[in-house]
Amino acid sequence: MNYELLTTENAPVKMWTKGVPVEADARQQLINTAKMPFIFKHIAVMPDVHLGKGSTIGSVIPTKGAIIPAAVGVDIGCGMNALRTALTAEDLPENLAELRQAIETAVPHGRTTGRCKRDKGAWENPPVNVDAKWAELEAGYQWLTQKYPRFLNTNNYKHLGTLGTGNHFIEICLDESDQVWIMLHSGSRGIGNAIGTYFIDLAQKEMQETLETLPSRDLAYFMEGTEYFDDYLKAVAWAQLFASLNRDAMMENVVTALQSITQKTVRQPQTLAMEEINCHHNYVQKEQHFGEEIYVTRKGAVSARAGQYGIIPGSMGAKSFIVRGLGNEESFCSCSHGAGRVMSRTKAKKLFSVEDQIRATAHVECRKDAEVIDEIPMAYKDIDAVMAAQSDLVEVIYTLRQVVCVKG
C-alpha cells in the first residue's frame, strides 16, 4: 500500500504523500470535504497536495448525485500541452533571449490593470487560427450568454490563444536525448473565471438556509436533477473546451515563432500520442469507477488511466516529466499535476530576493524580476520526492529540463 489512510467520520482519504510534506490546514480541508454525504468511496490525494482556495489542490473528489463548484474552482480546464518537436538543442539559437522574445510576441501574456487601457494579455486583432477555434465554441457561447447574459460582459473571444498570469507559462525544454519540446500551461482565462465565480456564488445563495451546517461555505453544491446542476455542467464543459482550444492555439503560434527563429520544420512528420499531449488538471467530468458512473472532480490532478499520457511540470528551473498512466483505480486513475507549493506566494516574496531568483534560474532564459519571485523553485516541493510518492500511479517516459520560460 503506497498511500496513507486518513479516516474521517464519513469517507476516508487516501493520500499518496510518502516522503513529501502536507500542511495541517490542507489535511483539515480534506477532512471537511470528506464529510460531505455524496462522496463516493474515498477522496484520493496526490503528492503535490497543498491548501487551496475553495478546495485542496492535488485532490481527486468523486461524487454521486452532486457537484461542488468551488472544488472545480475558477480556473476551469486549466491544464498542460506538450509537443516533442523535430528540433534538437543544436537547432536552437545561441542567444535564447531572441527565442523568448519571439514567443512573447506570438502569444499575448500578462495583464494590464486600470480602465481605458488596452489589455496586453488579450488580442487586439486575433489571428486566423483563433477565429477557427472560436467557431468551435460559438454555439456553446450563444447558449451560455442567452441564458446568462452576464457572461456577455467578459473577456472571451479575445482571450482565446492567450497565456494569462500567475503560474501559467510557456517553456522550451530538452529531453534526455536533447530533443526540443514545447510545453505550456494555461486554462479558460477570463470567461472561465467568470463562470466559476458566478456558479460558486450561486451554489452558496441556493443553500443559504443550510449553508451554516456545512463544514465550509466553499462546500456548497448543486444536486443532480436540478436546473442549476445541469446548467453548471454544461457551462463547465464549454469552459473546459475553451481551455483545451486555448492551449492548442498557443501551441500553434509558438510553433510558428520557433520556426521563424530556427528556419527549420518544427513539427515532426508523424507525431506519436506520447509526443503531443493536451490534458486538463482542473476539471470535472462523468467517469466510471468501481463499476459505477460518478462525477470526478480533479483539482490539481491529471487523469492517468492505463496507457494514458500526461504532463507533470516541475517548478521554474526544475525538471518536468512526460508520464504514462498505470490505471491505479484506488487513485481514481489520477496523478499529480506538478510539484505543489510548500509556501504561499506572499511568503515566497517575503523570504526570497531577486538575487535568489537569478541564482535558482541561472540555466533558464526567463524573467528574473521581483514580480516572479513567488514562482521561485524553492517555493515548491522537491519534484523527485513527488514522483517517488506516485510510482504506482504513473511511469516516466521523458524527463525534460527547461531552457526558456515565458511567464505572464
Swiss-Prot record:
Reported effect, D75A: Almost no guanylation activity. Can ligate pre-guanylated nucleotide substrates
Upper classification of the organism: Bacteria, Pseudomonadati, Pseudomonadota, Gammaproteobacteria, Enterobacterales
Enzyme class, spelled out: ligase
Keywords from the UniProt entry: GTP-binding, Ligase, Manganese, Metal-binding, Nucleotide-binding, RNA repair
UniProt-recorded name of the protein: RNA-splicing ligase RtcB
Gene Ontology biological process: DNA damage response; DNA repair; RNA processing; RNA repair
The record's free-text note on cofactor binding: Binds 2 manganese ions per subunit.
EC number: 6.5.1.8
